[in-house]
């Protein structure tokens, strides 16, 4: 098999739809062996290079189970994409502690635990790529995004620290920062015509991005070509955040 990721094994969480599904499909098309993970088994076509796993990333045994599944299917691990995430909107006055904790449990704690389980395999190879899903909210705030915004700031800080800790082992760590993208998670927001008009107007590109627009830079960051790129956030926003 030829392709940018030929011979590499990738784990992609949150792979049943949206950005995670687009990344899993593109990695597979570019030659990678992919373990696609989601709460319900992803509907991707399983084959010799695509394995599917139904797993709650917050479960106590999730990190070990996910790593074991990748090893059983493909014999190792090279690339980890921590894409699984949730958004439970709420301002400081109405965000419940339960919803705050749940956002951090999925968006930060699970990401940390799975990464912790994956790193030894990458260290043993002397090569690895860790790609976390941040957001433009990793740098900014937004209305009623108290918990979500804080969790994505945490993803940015965690990823930068990973880059410092792991660079000597041939492992890079970066995070993607999409703005509004057409996904299942964004659907409740996209149904608001004012929200949609805001992002279409803010982006010089004049439209809202698709999951495939996020998958393309995710491919580069997982490749050998990105060996000197680490600790960075990549904004995928159609130029929206360049506008004053």
Stretches found by the model and what they are:
Residues 115, 151, 159:
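Active-site helix of classical SDR
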Residues 120, 164-165, 227:
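Alpha-helical segment proximal to the catalytic Tyr-Lys
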Residues 81, 167, 172, 229-231:
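Short, small/polar-rich loop/turn modules that mediate ligand/substrate recognition or access, typified
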Residues 203-214:
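A conserved structural motif in NAD(P)-dependent oxidoreductases
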Residues 135:
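Residue(s) in the substrate-gating loop at a strand-loop-helix junction
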Residues 140, 219, 230-244:
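Short C-terminal tail/terminal secondary-structure segment
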Residues 91-92, 99-104, 195, 199:
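Substrate-binding pocket helix/loop in short-chain dehydrogenase/reductase
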């Amino acid at each position: 098999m030829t392709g940018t990721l030929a011979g590499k094994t990738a784990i992609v969480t949150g792979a049943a739809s949206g950005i995670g599904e687009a990344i899993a499909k593109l990695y597979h098309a570019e030659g990678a062996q992919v373990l696609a993970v989601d709460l319900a088994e992803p509907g991707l076509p399983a084959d010799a290079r695509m394995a599917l796993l139904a797993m709650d990333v917050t479960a106590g045994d999730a990190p070990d189970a996910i790593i074991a599944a990748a090893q059983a299917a493909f014999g190792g691990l090279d690339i980890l994409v921590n894409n699984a995430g949730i958004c439970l909107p709420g301002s400081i006055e109405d965000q419940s502690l339960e919803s705050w904790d749940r956002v951090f449990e999925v968006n930060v704690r699970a990401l940390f635990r799975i990464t912790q389980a994956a790193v030894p395999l990458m260290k043993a190879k002397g090569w690895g790529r860790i790609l976390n899903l941040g957001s433009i909210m990793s740098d900014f705030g937004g209305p009623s995004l108290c918990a979500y915004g804080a969790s994505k700031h945490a993803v940015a800080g965690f990823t930068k620290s990973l880059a410092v800790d792991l660079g000597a082992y041939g492992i890079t760590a970066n995070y993607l920062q999409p703005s509004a993208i057409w996904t299942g998670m964004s659907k409740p927001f996209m149904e608001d015509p004012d929200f949609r008009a805001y992002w279409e107007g803010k982006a010089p590109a004049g439209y809202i991005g698709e999951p495939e627009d996020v998958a393309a830079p995710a491919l580069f960051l997982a490749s050998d070509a990105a060996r000197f790129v680490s600790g960075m956030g990549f904004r995928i926003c159609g130029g929206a955040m360049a506008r004053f």
